[in-house]
Amino acid sequence: MLSGKRRLLFRLISVLFPLVLLLLLEVSLRFFAPSLDSPFVREAAVDTVRMLQVNRAYLERYFPANAPMVPELKPGLMRARKTKGVFRVFCVGESSMLGTPYELSATIPALVRKQLRHLFPAPEIEVMNFGASAINSNVVADLAPSLADLSPDAVLLYLGHNEFYGPDGVGAPWIEKKFPALTELKYRARDIRIVRLAQRMLGSFMRGSQDGERNLMKQVSRGATVEAGSAEEVRVIGRFGENLRRIIKTFRDRGICVIASDVTSSLMFPPFISGARHEEIPPLIASGNFTEALGRLEVLKGTDTADAFTDYWLGRAHLALGDTREAARFLRRARDEDLLKFRAPARTDSIIHSVCREESVPCIAVDSIFSALSPAGITGATLFWEHLHPTARGYDIIARAFVGEMIRLPILPPSGGEPGLLPFDADSLSLSWLDLAYGEISVRALTGRWPFTDFISPSPLLDSADPAERKMVTDVYLKKTGWTDACLQFASYEEKSGRAREAIRTYGALIEEYPFEYYPRYRRAALLRDEGDITRAVAEYRRAIALNPAHAYSLIDLGLILNNAGEFDEARVRLSRALELTGGKDLPLPRAQACYGLAAICANTGDIPKALAWLDESLRLAPSYAPARQLRAQILAHAR
């Protein structure tokens, strides 16, 4: 029979042994299963520059293991070591901040970056896109410390639409609804390698057995409805306020400037789900019988004071009759009463403004700005694609508001750029056709399934595109082609098709996204030169050479331009360097061009014998090179 001490020891061993095994398994997984490591950022290198790249798969910890689709972060790059010469801005939010339906140059972060680089060319401007589809303030509050660790100078917040259907919104377990702190503990537990391994194994099994369409809106909402003023709505919006305060304090405690915005949506978009649809009303509105429609709706309103469709059609009827104030009131009620809460109710914006006032954080009234710029002061299709994602023009308005607030605050570096913001046009903002057409495809796919019904989105760019252009944008949408390759392919096609401005815009979009790549700068410089924009061409050539000093083609092109401008000393240095780089290589034409350029310099400075010698070498390398033949003939004719 065991003594008391031995019995206690046996019990301790029986308890500790499994824990030790789990600890050993955890340590083993950390050493021998690196794929389970999922840091927020990873080190990367661009040429010789040490960078940090955002882990696009980081959001998996916030979604159930059996989720068919897990949203991703944009895998942006920033310098690993932030110096005084770097001004870093983080754009944080949901799908609207991500840029849906766009991917490249028409998003809020891209437009903010473009304007800041225009206004402040001296510092290196980094604008990182930390928006993602289907996330909410629960996720952002958890991410905030990791974001703050990366030392941004400013954080721009645009979030509030996904509070109901984002992670642990209405779908949170009942115990987490009672004790919200458990949500944070759950996220921490998912950092444990054993938990992560179990999640991935379960997720792989579950996803392999799932059929049907991949619909993120259906997946995150599960069709759950929420009534206006219900206890669940009050809980979710209250939690949003707590999270927002926590997010702001996380950054402010580190001395990081925060600029928030309220959120906006289309009031002209009908509710997704309501108590009744009132099928007899839309035909009356469509046929112009507004007074009759209004009378019927007022009767219906008396029987149900909180029906979204009743209020929506009341708003439409009042708008048609010219009563814009009443129209706006009913349309706002309809949005708030929509049982499917994909648009933030008015209470969300009230919370945003209230928290920002309490925390002394500037808050941009984007919803008011959109209303002021919309027909009759009612937001709709002029600035929105569907229920809440803005068009390129809408995103530009939000970006301008953020930049304007940054200028007003004393946080930006000294300006050495052009006065005033760039205008909203494709050339100034480098809005590539490829990205804008991608938006049309993306919206068509989004609105062609639940919860949308009978929604037709315009696609003027796709409708007027040729087959090759349509194929290129379709391939990038289907992920058959990556964005960099697609942009290079598209720009080359447009260039060969004689549409130089479109190619220039696309190269510009690539440069904004990948500023450390020399090749888009070289091609853009060549097109600007051919278009006669010599000043911008020279600036772009210089940047390309700074990124790749061994690129002979950029050196030759710049040398020839400088010769024509009378800057002979620098031109000689550039062209001589190009000859050194191409020496011993089978590159007769570039070498012939460099020799021709040196001949032109000699001719312009009066050294005719040396000019002829360089021309002889140029024609030896490329006997049919016309510029060398013409210059030689001119020199000989002048000598006679």
Where are these regions (language model features)?
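Membrane/wall-proximal cationic-aromatic binding patches
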Residues: S35-F120, L373
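Short coil turns that delineate tetratricopeptide repeat
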Residues: P152, T305-A306, L339, T481, ...
